[in-house]
């Protein structure tokens, strides 16, 4: 299970999801815990933003139009080795979780995400 409690209190979290309402909700939740949050609505947008400003953690949707969350994770690891990535999905299956874990993602969460799963 992922936990943000190991991050320093003012850590920067990069949130990536193609669902605008989820981006807004998760951003508010994370900011209320003291984290700095940046967002992107696509994996490609996230990579562009990460090139400008690094994050302490990336929290990304698995299934997005264009590049998916696992491909984003692989690109992040090739450019910023060791940056932790948590993959989240509304349609999580055991094979998805196994693939994500074998790829080396920090954690895999199924939406809706319970506040206790993160903090």
What are these regions (language model features)?
Residues 48, 70-81, 99:
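Short amphipathic alpha-helix used as the core "switch/output" element in two-component signaling
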């Amino acid at each position: 299970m992922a936990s943000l409690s190991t991050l320093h209190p003012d850590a920067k979290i990069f949130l990536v999801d193609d669902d605008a309402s989820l981006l807004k909700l998760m951003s508010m939740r994370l900011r209320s815990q003291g984290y700095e949050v940046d967002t992107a609505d696509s994996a490609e947008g996230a990579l562009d933003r990460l090139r400008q400003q690094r994050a302490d953690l990336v929290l990304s949707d698995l299934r997005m139009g264009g590049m998916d969350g696992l491909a984003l994770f692989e690109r992040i690891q090739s450019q910023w080795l060791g940056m932790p990535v948590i993959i989240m999905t509304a349609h999580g299956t055991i094979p998805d979780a196994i693939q994500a874990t074998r790829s080396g993602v920090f954690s895999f969460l199924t939406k809706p995400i319970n506040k206790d799963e993160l903090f």
